[in-house]
C-alpha cells in the first residue's frame, strides 16, 4: 500500500504538446505505479488528444466543463462534469474540450498508451453538428 497526499510533491503542471492539439495542461496525481498512470488534464476550448489506444484500458472522470469523446467508427459523444467513461483495451479514440468550453478530467490509464496521428479538424468538428 502507498498513500499519496495531494499532488506529487515537487511536481509541476506540464503543458502537453506532442500528442495533443491546442492548449492542454496535465498534473500528475501519482507517479506511474504498476502500469497505472493518473493525471488531471485541463483542455482549453478546441483542445483534444491525438488518436490513441490503451493496452489495458482507460477511465476518464470529467471534473469540470464539457467536451467530446469519440471511438473510431462512431459519432462523437458529449461528456460533461460528473460523467465517467470506460475505454476498453485497444479501442482507438480521442477526447477533449468542445469548441466553446474548457474541460478537465482525471485520466486513469492502465498499461501502455499508443499515440497515433492528430484528429483532423473536420472529424473533430463533426461533434459540433
Residue ranges: model-predicted function:
Residues 1-36, 115-129:
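A short, N-terminal "cap"/entry segment at the start of jelly-roll beta-barrel domains
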Residues 39-54, 89:
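Conserved short histidine dyad/triad with adjacent acidic residue
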Residues 49-51, 69-70, 92-99:
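Short beta-strand His + acidic residue motifs that chelate non-heme Fe in jelly-roll/DSBH
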Residues 55-67, 72-73:
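Glycine- and acidic-residue-biased ligand/ion/polar-headgroup-sensing regions
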Residues 59, 86, 100-118:
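A short hydrophobic beta-strand segment most commonly corresponding to one strand
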Residues 73-90:
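Short acidic-glycine-tyrosine-enriched beta hairpin
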Amino acid at each position: 500500500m502507498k498513500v499519496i497526499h495531494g499532488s506529487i510533491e515537487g511536481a509541476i503542471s506540464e503543458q502537453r504538446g506532442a500528442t495533443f492539439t491546442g492548449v492542454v495542461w496535465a498534473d500528475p496525481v501519482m507517479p506511474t505505479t504498476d502500469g497505472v498512470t493518473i493525471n488531471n488534464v485541463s483542455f482549453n476550448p478546441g483542445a483534444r488528444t491525438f488518436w490513441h489506444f490503451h493496452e489495458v484500458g482507460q477511465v476518464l472522470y470529467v471534473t469540470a466543463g464539457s467536451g467530446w469523446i469519440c471511438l473510431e467508427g462512431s459519432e462523437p459523444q458529449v461528456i460533461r462534469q460528473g460523467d465517467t467513461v470506460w475505454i476498453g483495451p485497444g479501442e482507438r479514440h480521442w477526447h477533449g474540450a468542445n469548441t466553446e468550453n474548457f474541460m478537465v478530467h482525471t485520466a486513469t490509464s492502465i498499461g501502455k498508451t499508443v499515440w497515433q496521428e492528430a484528429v483532423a479538424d473536420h472529424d473533430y468538428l463533426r461533434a459540433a453538428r
